[in-house]
């Protein structure tokens, strides 16, 4: 193997000064171009870079002050506090705006419309329940018990007050009927002063601390309570009505009304100066208000009014005699009238009023329509389909329809029978104490819970979004007048072939008409829409920062940059921690084992010889520093 000298020198060839300067300049420019070249994704190296770039380039007013005044710490602190305070005030205003928006306020719009008006439905009742001739046998027993009760409590003999001859006959007949009633219903009898017998679970009028009421007990008589009244008249009527309902429940459906029933009650009917006919009304029977007739309820041919005034409305002459009235059930005379919208049931006890005999009652109407916003703006319902109460009426949804249906459904569920005044649900039967012994106790308990809204009916039944109401005002005058009553009564008796014996107390006249041609519509519109919200937010942003939508995007970009750099720094910290905690790699098989375990405690170091062939090195002009050296040459000695 050949040998080589241990030493030597390599001398580089000297490059001209101009060439070296030119080459260094080219390399510097190339490096600057590489530094200025922007990649597809570039990012900041620290939070300070992000914040400084944002403050230097944003269009938000005041942000540049945080950078420009960095040499003055007092100004920097002042502008920082002012910037944060401004942001806080702005977002406080934002919170107020959002709270107002999500409260869903509405504006009330009042419109006055002029158009042909559809005449409402009008229901008129006789205030005469089932006549004595229809259920006299069923009522005799109840009358005798009531007569005896009045005699016990007030020392008033009702039979003698009416007529002496009929009183003796009625008393004998009632006694036989009462005995027959007790034999047919083998219940426990309760002795009273004059041996008046009452069924065991039948309410009985009682006198306690000058309060009149009746006792109601559960089926096993373990729980009883007094339904008391401050007025004896109210107590007797309520008690009588309770038994009257039981009598109606034991009877088949009300008899069909024919044209003679209508003519016996309605002497004359005109609308828009035209005579009414049978196609203009429907009829039904109310347990307390008697035969009822509803005019203009046929949706296929509704009446319309082109002009206001008494001559362009409905005019009725009705009979108000009380020859066959039930005195213990009906204590008023006349007729009862109610104005309501089509396809709505007539709840006479809620919205009706009485018409006096011998009086012409003129009722003027003003139509009002209400349209509410549904959804988030109000708790109204469009058609009741979203209300958790079954509609028992064959009519459209109203709040009163829902409330009564709710009570009836709870009545069937709790008492196992239905209240006679309300529609009958499928599969149920009306309450009758011959079948449901303690239904009265259950009913009055349930009624108290209903009035206190324990049943939740008032909460479940929501208002409809669209309603039509009629504002009524009435005027009264004597009819007919003293100078014209003779010929008026004569003509009515000849026309209807009926002899009016009581004259003035036997008839009444009713006029129902529109007061004005206009009708009012109360509507709702959103008071704070999305457009209004965005406008208010923009106004607040411009007020506090004088910026635009793009400034908001800059702020969103800043938040995104802070999020990304936080993720990057966290990722770097995690990788660095993982790299420092990893063990050293094992030595490779080609490594020189002479350098392993150098400090293992050996006595003498290993000796080795390295032989190399030294040749002349090439010239590396790029390694020379740009600019002249001290000696004017570059090389290795």
From Swiss-Prot:
Disulfide bonds join 125-292, 217-224, 269-276, 380-465, 402-442, 402-461, 406-457, 415-442, 415-465, 417-431. It is a multi-pass membrane protein. Residues 11-34 have a biased composition (Basic and acidic residues). Keywords: Cell membrane, Cell projection, Cilium, Cytoplasm, Cytoplasmic vesicle, Disulfide bond, Flagellum, Ion channel, Ion transport, Membrane, Sodium, Sodium channel, Sodium transport, Transmembrane, Transmembrane helix, Transport. It catalyses: Na(+)(in) = Na(+)(out). One of its GO terms (biological process) is multicellular organismal-level water homeostasis. The keyword Transmembrane helix applies. Originally identified and characterized by its inhibition by the diuretic drug amiloride. Pfam families: ASC (PF00858). It comes from Gallus gallus (Chicken). It is found in: Apical cell membrane; Cell projection, Cilium; Cytoplasmic granule; Cytoplasm. Residues 1-34 are annotated as: Disordered. Residues 1-76, 570-637 are cytoplasmic. The keyword Transmembrane applies. One of its GO terms (cellular component) is acrosomal vesicle. This is Epithelial sodium channel subunit alpha. One of its GO terms (molecular function) is ligand-gated sodium channel activity. The long isoform has been found in cochlea, colon, and cartilage. The short isoform is only found in cochlea.
């Amino acid at each position: 193997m050949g040998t080589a000298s241990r030493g030597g020198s390599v001398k580089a060839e000297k490059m001209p000064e101009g060439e070296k300067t030119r080459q260094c300049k080219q390399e510097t420019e190339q490096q600057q171009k590489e530094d200025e070249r922007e990649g597809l994704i570039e990012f900041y190296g620290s939070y300070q870079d992000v914040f400084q770039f944002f403050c230097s380039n944003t269009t938000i007013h005041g942000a540049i002050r945080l950078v420009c005044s960095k040499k003055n710490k007092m100004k920097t602190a002042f502008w920082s506090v002012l910037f944060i305070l401004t942001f806080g005030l702005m977002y406080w205003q934002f919170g107020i705006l959002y709270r107002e928006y999500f409260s869903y306020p509405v504006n009330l719009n009042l419109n006055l419309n002029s158009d042909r008006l559809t005449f409402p439905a009008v229901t008129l009742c006789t205030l005469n329940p089932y006549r004595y001739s229809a259920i006299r046998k069923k009522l005799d027993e109840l009358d005798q018990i009531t007569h005896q009760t009045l005699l016990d409590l007030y020392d008033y003999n009702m039979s003698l007050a009416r007529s002496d001859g009929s009183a003796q006959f009625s008393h004998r007949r009632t006694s036989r009927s009462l005995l027959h009633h007790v034999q047919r219903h083998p219940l426990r009898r309760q002795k009273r002063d004059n041996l008046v017998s009452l069924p065991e679970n039948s309410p009985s009028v009682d006198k306690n601390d000058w309060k009149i009421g009746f006792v109601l007990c559960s089926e096993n008589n373990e729980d009883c309570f007094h339904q008391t009244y401050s007025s004896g008249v109210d107590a007797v009527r309520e008690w009588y009505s309770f038994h009257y309902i039981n009598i109606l429940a034991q009877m088949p459906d009300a008899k069909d009304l024919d044209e003679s029933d209508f003519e016996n009650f309605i002497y004359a009917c005109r609308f828009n100066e035209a005579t009414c006919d049978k196609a203009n009304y429907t009829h039904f029977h109310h347990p307390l208000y008697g035969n009822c007739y509803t005019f203009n309820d046929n949706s296929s041919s509704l009446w319309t009014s082109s002009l206001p005034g008494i001559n362009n409305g409905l005019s009725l002459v009705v009979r108000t005699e009380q020859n066959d009235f039930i005195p213990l059930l009906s204590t008023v005379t006349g007729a009862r009238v109610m104005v309501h919208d089509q396809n709505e049931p007539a709840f006479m006890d809620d919205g009706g009023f009485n018409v006096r005999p011998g009086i012409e009652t003129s009722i003027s109407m003003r139509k009002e329509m209400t349209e509410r916003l549904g959804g988030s703006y109000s708790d109204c319902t469009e058609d009741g389909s979203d209300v958790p109460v079954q509609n028992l009426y064959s009519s459209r949804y109203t709040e009163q329809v829902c409330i009564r249906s709710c009570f009836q459904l709870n009545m069937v569920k709790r008492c196992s029978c239905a209240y006679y005044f309300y529609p009958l649900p499928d599969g149920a039967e009306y309450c009758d104490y011959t079948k449901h012994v303690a239904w009265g106790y259950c009913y009055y308990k349930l009624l108290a819970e209903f009035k206190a809204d324990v049943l939740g009916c008032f909460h479940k039944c929501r208002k409809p979004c669209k309603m039509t109401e009629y504002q009524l005002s009435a005027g009264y005058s004597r009819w007919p007048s003293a100078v014209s009553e003779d010929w008026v009564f004569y003509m009515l008796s000849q026309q209807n072939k009926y002899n009016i014996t009581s004259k003035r107390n036997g008839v009444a006249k009713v006029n129902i008409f529109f007061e004005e041609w206009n009708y009012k519509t109360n509507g709702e519109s959103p008071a704070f829409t999305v457009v209004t919200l965005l406008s208010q937010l923009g106004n607040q942003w411009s007020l506090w920062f004088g910026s635009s939508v793009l400034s908001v995007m800059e702020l969103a970009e800043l938040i995104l940059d802070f999020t990304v750099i936080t993720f990057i720094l966290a990722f770097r910290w995690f990788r660095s921690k993982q790299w420092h905690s990893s063990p050293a790699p094992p030595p490779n098989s080609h490594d020189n084992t002479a350098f392993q375990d150098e400090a293992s405690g050996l006595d003498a170091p290993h000796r080795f010889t390295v032989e190399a062939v030294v040749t002349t090195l090439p010239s590396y002009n790029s390694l020379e520093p740009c600019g002249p050296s001290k000696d004017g040459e570059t090389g290795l000695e």
